[in-house]
C-alpha cells in the first residue's frame, strides 16, 4: 500500500459522532508514551499530523485520519496514566468499549507495545480487553532501534509468549523506518478484506 494522502478528519468524544460513511478503519492503541503518534506519522508520511499530547494520558478522544480518501487510521486514546479524574477515566472506558463492541467498519486494531518492556501488565490487560470483544488485533513493537539484536530477539520471544489471540507480531522503528513497508503491506490486506 502506498499512502498518497492523509489528513485529519475529526475528533470524537461521543459514539454518536463517529463517522457514518462506512469506510474501513484500522485503529491504533497503546499505552501513553509508547510511540503511537510517531508510528502513525511515519506510516502516513507526515511529521506532525497525529500529535502527542503534552501531558501523557490527557488525550481522551478518538481521532480519525482519512487516508487516500478511502479509509481511516484511528488514533485511540493512550492508556496507563491515572492523572485524570475518575469520571474522565469512566467516560474514556465507555467510549472505548462502545467503539470496540459496535464498530462494524473496524477491520483491525494495532496494539503498540514498547519493545524494551515486552510484557507489561497494562499491555496484557489490553490484550484481554481486545480478546474479550473478539476483535482482530495485531501487536507492533515500537522503539526497536533502542535495543541491540540480541536484546531485541529476547524481547520478541517474551512478547510472543505473553500475548495471545493476535493476528501477527512485528517490529517497528519510527527513527529508522524499519518495518514501515511491511506493516503497510499487511494493513492493506485487512483494509481490502
UniProtKB/Swiss-Prot annotation:
Q: What GO molecular-function term can you cite, just one?
A: metal ion binding
Tell me which cofactor or cofactors this protein depends on. Answer: Mg(2+)
GO annotation, biological process: division septum assembly
Lineage, top-rank taxon, reads Bacteria
**Keyword terms, alphabetized:** Cell cycle, Cell division, GTP-binding, Magnesium, Metal-binding, Nucleotide-binding, Septation
Cite the Pfam families for this sequence: MMR_HSR1
Chain positions recorded as Mg(2+) binding sites:
37, 59
Where GTP binds, per the record, is at 30-37, 57-61, 75-78, 142-145, 172-174
Query: What is this protein for, i.e. what is its function?
Result: Necessary for normal cell division and for the maintenance of normal septation.
Designated name of the protein: Probable GTP-binding protein EngB
Organism per entry: Chloroherpeton thalassium (strain ATCC 35110 / GB-78)
This protein's encoding gene: engB
